Each structure stands twice: as C-alpha cells, then as structure tokens.
C-alpha cells in the first residue's frame, strides 16, 4: 500500500493505493494518528480510487477514520464506490 498526503490551507487529502490489508493496516492507523491532530481547522478527503483490496481490518480502520471525521471519500471505480458506500453505510447503522 502507498499512502500519499497532500496538505493545503483548508484541506488534507490522504491518497491510498494498493491493498489496505494485513501489515498495511497498522501503517494506515499510524499515519492517521499523526495527521488527526492537524484536522482541527482542516477538512479531510480520502482518495480510495486506486485501492485494489481492503480486508476486514482495513475496512474497519477506514470506518473509524470516517466516523471521526466524516471525510469526503473520493471514488471513481465500481470497487472504490462499493468500498465507500460500505464504509459510510456501516457507520450510519451504528
């Protein structure tokens, strides 16, 4: 998995590429823990367009980030759109 972070005055965009699974889930959580304090005055976007797979742990990590931030999820492929809907719907049912 590759994580790219782009920061601007009002936003932080986290771009994820590859598999959000296995040993990469703790890395996503670590990066999130570092960036979360900076969100007080910024909005978060998570670009999942190039995510090819997310296991249960990866989906859970993304759900937790979404639950804390209501981040804008960027998805333009059927898989990414499915993943985005799954993340948002599960949060809304909770």
Model-identified regions with their sequence ranges:
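Amphipathic alpha-helical interaction surfaces in cytosolic regulatory modules
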Residues: 16-93
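Short beta-strand/loop segment at the start of cytosolic alpha/beta domains
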Residues: 1-15
